[in-house]
Amino acid sequence: RYRAATGREPTVLLEPDPPGWLTGTLRLAGWDPASCVEWAGAPARVDRLVVPLHRNRYFTPRDGQFADDFNPAPGDVRWLADRMQSNVPDLDAGEFSPRVFLSRRDTATRPVANEDAVRETLEPLGFESYALGEMAVADQVRLFANAETVVAPHGAGLVNVIHATDATVVELFPEDKVEPYYFCLARQLGFDYHWSVYPTREEAMVVDTGDLRATVSRALDG
């Protein structure tokens, strides 16, 4: 909209040595990462600063505003999803399961201590395990565009639900990291949302597989 209204091409600032998921996302959203500027956060002077209309307030449940203040605009979310999907060929190729479990085997933060048991619990229900860090951004878009049910430990990979059409989300929280971000995102998109909280041991979440089976079964029946 800024470009259409002003005829100016805004400069996008990136962190130094940006990760592949970031450059891949920019490329699918229509920006060439090569035309962006890497900025380490040092003091800088700009002639014109563009401030987006929709800004989100970050908070924790302890603020007492768990559900109401983190409200990404649905129109903005859909705009980004539509723009990215328009640049992904074979979006409906059908190569991924519509029942998705997001593994954390590709990250050192907030691992699942008994992930093998979690996977064995979900497989009879038709779920397949995917590690997003091992997938190209375009494949992540394809995965979520065809997803019907997503079971995932709390983590940034759940942002990809913006590519789903009508999904059910089951979020698994470690007891020391209960945050509202993806509940609010799912709510804004009109998705069914379920959650469970589990204890941690040495910074790894320990999932009660009996509770998980019951929670996911309720979600599938809903």
Region annotations inferred by a language model:
Residues 1-222:
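The feature primarily captures lumenal catalytic ectodomains
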